[in-house]
């Protein structure tokens, strides 16, 4: 009953944002149901929506700015308009955010680990995505996915996850696009220089997958989404692998890299 009620609320949320529009998704298409096995839908009871990535049977990685109180995490969700009998739902038992994260800057160290109240079971449409063994190189083709907006600035939420291919860009592209970025950063700059492909509202916390490896977490970007010379900024997962492994090993006091 809880699952039915929550998915009904998600549908209401999706319909409440919908605008009459013939525009296509921001550079992407509906994901193949077999390509988002690690994608988690992170739902907060207030209606706030994020994505996440299953990294093993009991842990999900998402963005720290998605931390909004009580969380329900769903797996094997495709359409928000209909119940899939194989959907698995879990409660966030514990949440871990970098202890050295700047409290007044939600863009800083935008990464959060969620421990589920019980492990999920692998299935045809549920499987974890392993952490990266190396960082991505500039020019790498990467996949973004999520239930986020398919039009911007007028928001239309699609009700099914959409996927698009973007590229890893030189960090200097983002420094030119957004004032105030530091000279070095534990983030990835990714997008299409001419615009038209981008993550957007509701995609936060979802994965950036490059050559089959989980390389980034959707963090922030320009509004409206998909502007030329305004790529997205993604948390660089590779730089946090030691912290992630420490938390998974039981070291709750582990500190993130500066």
From Swiss-Prot:
Keyword Flavoprotein: no
EC number, as in UniProt: 3.4.21.-
SMART domains: Tryp_SPc (SM00020)
Glycosylated position list: 154
Pro-peptide positions on chain: 19-24
GO molecular function: serine-type endopeptidase activity; toxin activity
Gene Ontology process terms (BP): proteolysis
A cellular-component GO term for this protein: secretory granule
Keywords: Disulfide bond, Glycoprotein, Hemostasis impairing toxin, Hydrolase, Protease, Secreted, Serine protease, Signal, Toxin
Keyword Hydrolase: yes
Active site (record annotation): 65, 110, 204
Tissues/organs with expression: Expressed by the venom gland.
Superkingdom of the source species: Eukaryota
Subcellular location: Secreted
Signal peptide: 1-18
Sequence ranges assigned to domain Peptidase S1 in this UniProt record: 25-249
Leading EC class: hydrolase
Function noted in UniProt: Snake venom serine protease that may act in the hemostasis system of the prey.
Family, per entry: Belongs to the peptidase S1 family. Snake venom subfamily.
Annotated PANTHER family: KALLIKREIN-1, KALLIKREIN-RELATED
Protein name per its UniProtKB record: Snake venom serine protease
Source lineage: Eukaryota, Metazoa, Chordata, Craniata, Vertebrata
């Amino acid at each position: 009953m809880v699952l039915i009620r929550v998915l009904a609320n998600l549908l209401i949320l999706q319909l409440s944002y919908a605008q009459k529009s013939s525009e296509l998704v921001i550079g992407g298409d509906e994901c193949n149901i077999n390509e988002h096995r690690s994608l988690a839908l992170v739902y907060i009871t207030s209606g706030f929506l994020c994505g996440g990535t299953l990294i093993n049977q009991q842990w999900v990685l998402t963005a720290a700015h998605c931390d909004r109180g009580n969380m329900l995490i769903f797996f094997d969700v495709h359409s928000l308009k209909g119940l899939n009998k194989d959907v698995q739902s879990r409660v966030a038992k514990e949440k871990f955010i970098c202890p050295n994260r700047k409290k007044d800057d939600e863009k800083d160290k935008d990464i959060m680990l969620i421990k589920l109240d019980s492990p999920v079971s692998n299935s045809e449409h549920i499987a974890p995505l392993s952490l990266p063994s190396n960082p991505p190189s500039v020019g790498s083709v990467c996949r973004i996915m999520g239930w986020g907006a398919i039009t911007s600035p007028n928001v239309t939420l699609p009700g099914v996850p959409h996927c698009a291919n973007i590229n890893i860009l030189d960090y200097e592209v983002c420094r030119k696009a957004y004032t105030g970025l530091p000279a070095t950063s534990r983030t990835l700059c990714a997008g299409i220089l001419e615009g038209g492909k981008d993550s957007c509202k509701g995609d936060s916390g979802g994965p950036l997958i490059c050559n089959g490896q989980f390389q980034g977490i959707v963090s922030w970007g320009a509004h409206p989404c998909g502007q030329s010379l305004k790529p997205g900024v993604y948390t660089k997962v590779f730089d946090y692998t030691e912290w992630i492994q420490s938390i998974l090993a039981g070291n709750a006091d582990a500190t993130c890299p500066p």
